[in-house]
């Protein structure tokens, strides 16, 4: 089997629950285990769909971003809809503790890195940012309790605007672009009279290798894709004592970011047709040894992906939300989920990594069409990115091809993620600036509202 790289960004969650009472420790443990199962299940289902596609492509997803987006939806669900969402998340029926768990998880994820600026420098400090938001059409009345819970537990800003206007979608896209530092410029959601609400999560990660590669050592070498094509791509050269392991079907190597060893990225090179799953990941994590000198050749690459999650989440148990959902915790009326999708970006070079994701859930009113069929994508080269203080998978993916044009510039990473649009809202939804010509945000009744300025 040709080399296949899998991308699986992982944040380690050993710190989750450190400040919680004994009564909640079991909930924390149950949610952490559920998250790990959810992460690999959603990835493996994508992998299956991708392998069936006519033209296999790279798969890069963030289970962490999807977890938060679906978690916000779960908060507004009741009865059997709540249970079907919990099933997809590997949580018990009627479970209501997810918001509290995610609140603590967000605190742990956003805690400052232990960083000695005098010794290591401010510029090399890893950056992990996440943001949530809730957007509702201006004619619908959302329940205050739901808005307040999202604000407190998910740090989600709330804004009402006319979702049938292109200007409204532009405002939401600007929020996403800002939170992902320009790496995801648009959610590609069309304005619609039927669209009532959008739940959005944005995730951004940027870090430098603890021991980087020299551009002078990078050479053009062949990369063999899953479709048996051969592409000449820039191969970076690492020669260090690295964490290395050999497990069933894979050779694995782990590279650390920064000097505090909180974040890491693991690459899995297949040696046969063994499927990459949670068991393989866990075996490698337990088997790593740094006693070996490892000479690693790794391609420099950039890849972007957009995936519809509807079919995958239906297979995982969330079929009811796409037909006739009970979302009465969010608002009154006949509601259903029309779209759940994720966009992602990944760039890897001699200095380090930039990874970002945005997940969006679109909620509409009316009767859902009886049948919709969806198609996703595919296949070669495995990896993981970890925050080893929280134990959570942030990104899962599968690199099958390298865009030769996108990786010719050895300084491409420095040009990514440093531009951002003007901030629109802070984490609690307060207005930061106007939205540009013809648009502004006003406060009415304690809530933000988008208005056209003539």
Regions from the language model: what does each represent?
Residues 1-4, 454:
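Positively charged n-region of N-terminal signal peptides that target proteins for export
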Residues 406-408, 441-454:
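C-terminal tail/sorting-segment detector
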Residues 56, 92-271, 287-369:
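Non-catalytic, conformational "gating/processing" segments within enzyme and secreted inhibitor domains
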Residues 404-431:
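Residue-level detector of functionally pivotal "anchor" positions at catalytic/ligand-binding pockets or at interdomain
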Residues 16-85, 95, 178, 367-370, ...:
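Flexible propeptides and autoinhibitory/regulatory segments associated with cysteine proteases
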């Amino acid at each position: 089997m040709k080399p296949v790289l899998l991308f699986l960004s992982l944040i380690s969650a050993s710190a989750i629950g450190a400040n919680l009472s004994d009564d909640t420790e079991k909930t924390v443990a149950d949610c952490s285990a559920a998250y790990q199962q959810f992460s690999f299940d959603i990835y493996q289902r994508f992998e299956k769909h991708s392998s069936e596609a006519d033209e296999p492509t790279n798969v890069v997803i963030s289970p962490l971003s999807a977890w938060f987006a679906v978690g916000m939806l779960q908060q507004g669900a009741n009865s059997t809809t709540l249970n079907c969402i919990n099933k997809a998340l590997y949580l018990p029926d009627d479970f209501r503790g997810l918001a509290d768990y995610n609140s603590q998880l967000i605190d742990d994820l956003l805690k400052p890195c232990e960083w000695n600026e005098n010794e290591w420098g401010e510029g090399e400090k890893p950056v992990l940012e996440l943001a949530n938001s809730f957007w509702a059409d201006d004619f619908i009345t959302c329940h205050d309790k739901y808005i307040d819970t999202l604000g407190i537990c998910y740090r989600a800003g709330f804004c009402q605007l006319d979702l049938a206007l292109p200007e409204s979608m532009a405002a939401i896209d600007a929020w996403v672009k800002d939170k992902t530092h320009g790496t995801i410029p648009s959610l590609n959601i069309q304005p619609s009279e039927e669209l009532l609400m959008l739940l959005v999560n944005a995730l951004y990660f940027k870090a430098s290798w603890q021991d980087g590669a020299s551009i002078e050592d990078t050479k053009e070498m062949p990369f063999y894709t899953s479709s048996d094509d051969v592409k000449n791509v820039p191969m970076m050269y690492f020669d260090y004592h690295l964490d290395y392991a050999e497990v069933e079907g894979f050779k694995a190597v782990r590279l650390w970011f920064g000097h505090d060893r909180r974040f890491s990225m693991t690459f899995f090179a297949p040696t046969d047709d063994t499927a990459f799953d949670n068991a393989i990941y866990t075996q490698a994590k337990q088997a790593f040894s740094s006693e070996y000198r490892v000479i690693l050749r790794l391609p420099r690459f950039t890849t972007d992906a957009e995936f519809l999650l509807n079919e995958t989440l239906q297979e995982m148990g969330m079929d009811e939300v796409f037909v006739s959902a009970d979302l009465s915790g969010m608002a009154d009326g006949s509601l259903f989920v029309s779209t759940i999708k994720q966009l992602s970006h990944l760039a890897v070079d001699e200095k380090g990594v930039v990874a970002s994701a945005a997940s969006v859930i679109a909620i509409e009113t009316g009767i859902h069409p009886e049948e919709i069929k969806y198609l996703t994508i595919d296949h070669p080269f495995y990896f993981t990115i970890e925050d080893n203080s929280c134990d959570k998978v942030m990104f899962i993916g599968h690199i099958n091809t390298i865009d030769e044009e996108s990786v010719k510039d050895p300084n491409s990473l420095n040009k990514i993620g440093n531009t951002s649009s003007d901030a629109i809202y802070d984490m609690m939804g307060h207005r930061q600036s106007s939205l540009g010509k013809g648009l502004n945000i006003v406060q009415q009744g304690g809530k933000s509202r988008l208005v056209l300025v003539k």
